[in-house]
């Protein structure tokens, strides 16, 4: 019985120390609407580190890592080779339920925030983010310099869908911070999870989460909803429109 009480007390004390700092955050816009002429935008994440009496007196400097993840989906990266003057697909790798959008921001270089072991465990930096692949009949994440993984990240980065910036987080005061979240024109639709992790003297202190949503509006959304919810009606209307277009074209261009 005494051991159980001591264990419970230890858990309580650990929980109390873990709550020595509390993160309070918010996003400038929790619902982003995408119209046909949407060209991208930048959201602003801002927040503060709230201390309490149990915060160590010598803890005055903090580090922050912000991770933004879009809706997850299966994706494929293909290897092309030139044979007989023609580029053909020779191999491919499937990535399973990986973020369609992924951004990591910090207030200083990731390798100066914490140790490599903690960085791997907390997935700090693109090289440490888990990207599960189908390798033959197995599922695994591979080494960061794997050719398919490197190509996948490079292609997503070129489209503005994957990024990391070790200077994007700014501390306005020792405890008040902000960062921008750039969204490209082709940003995927869905719910985006934002995870904010707090470090001090290389140690992981705690984290908090928030989210925002990207939705289509207007005629595009109406068409998408109709196709998803009433597939038969959508197919019939599409076929009718195609027939009408062909009929009108035959009238306009027919020879008298």
Walk through the language-model features, giving the residues of each:
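Membrane-proximal low-complexity regions enriched in glycine and acidic/polar residues
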Residues: 82-184, 188
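Juxtamembrane interface at the cytosolic side of transmembrane helices
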Residues: 232-256
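Sec/Tat signal peptide C-region and signal peptidase I cleavage site
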Residues: 16-20
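Extended, hydrophilic extramembrane loops/domains of integral membrane proteins
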Residues: 186-216
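N-terminal edge beta-strand
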Residues: 21-36
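Bacterial N-terminal signal peptides
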Residues: 7-15
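Short solvent-exposed capping/turn motifs at the termini of beta-strands
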Residues: 49-53
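Short, aromatic-rich amphipathic segments at membrane interfaces
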Residues: 182, 205-235
């Amino acid at each position: 019985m005494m051991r159980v009480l001591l264990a419970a007390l230890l858990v309580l004390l650990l929980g109390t120390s873990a709550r020595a700092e509390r993160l309070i955050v918010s996003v400038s816009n929790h619902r982003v609407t995408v119209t046909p002429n949407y060209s991208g935008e930048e959201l602003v994440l801002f927040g503060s580190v709230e201390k309490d009496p149990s915060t160590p007196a010598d803890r005055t400097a903090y580090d922050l890592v912000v991770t933004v993840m879009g809706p997850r989906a299966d994706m494929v990266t293909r290897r092309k080779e030139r044979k007989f003057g023609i580029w053909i697909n020779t191999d491919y790798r499937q990535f399973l339920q990986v973020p369609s959008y992924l951004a990591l921001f910090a207030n200083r270089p990731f390798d100066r925030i914490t140790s490599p072991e903690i960085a791997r465990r907390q997935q700090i930096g693109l090289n440490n983010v888990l990207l599960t692949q189908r390798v033959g009949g197995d599922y695994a994440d591979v080494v960061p310099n794997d050719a398919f993984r490197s190509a996948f990240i490079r292609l997503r980065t070129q489209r503005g869908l994957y990024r990391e910036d070790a200077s994007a987080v700014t501390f306005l005061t020792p405890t008040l911070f902000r960062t921008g979240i750039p969204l490209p024109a082709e940003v995927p639709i869905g719910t985006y999870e934002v995870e904010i992790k707090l470090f001090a003297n290389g140690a992981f202190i705690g984290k908090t989460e928030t989210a925002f949503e990207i939705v289509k509006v207007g005629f595009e959304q109406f068409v998408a909803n109709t196709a998803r919810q009433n597939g038969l009606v959508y197919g019939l209307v599409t076929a009718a429109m195609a027939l009408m277009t062909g009929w009108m074209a035959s009238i306009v261009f027919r020879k008298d």
